Amino acid sequence: QEVMFRNQFEMWRHRKDFDLYLTVDHADETWDGEEGLVTKPFEHLEIDPTNTFGALCGPPIMYRFVVQEMRKKDIPYDRIYMSFERHMKCGVGKCGHCQVGHQYCCIDGPVFNYWEAKNIQGSM
């Protein structure tokens, strides 16, 4: 029913130099995008891997499956970015709430490329 940043998504959807693929688990009658698993759009996705970046935001368990699909499309690991959404309490790395492995999302992230993330224990 509600999608965050809907206005921005609509703006991106109409750009000629940008392709946006959105999917939701369960859609209502107002949704005009994909419905199902987040990996579903990869079934019909045709891309140029040398001109493609992937940006992931969601639960960490999802990242493993989406990265597998991106790799099937030959998207290089260094072009896959993921956001580690953690509760950032202090914002300066003192409280440890946002710590993932040896990294602090408030200082070192929250966005990491795959090469950085794969070595962070507990990230995916």
Q: What spans do the regions from the language model cover?
A:
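Glycine-rich, flexible loop/turn motifs
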Residues: 34, 80, 102, 108, ...
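FNR/FR-type flavoprotein reductase catalytic core
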Residues: 1-89
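Alpha-helix termini
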Residues: 71, 104-106, 122
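Short linear functional motifs in flexible/disordered or boundary regions
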Residues: 21, 50, 92, 106-107, ...
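Local cysteine-cluster metal-coordination motifs and their immediate loop/turn environment
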Residues: 61, 85-110
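Short microdomains enriched in Cys/His and/or Lys/Arg
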Residues: 111-124
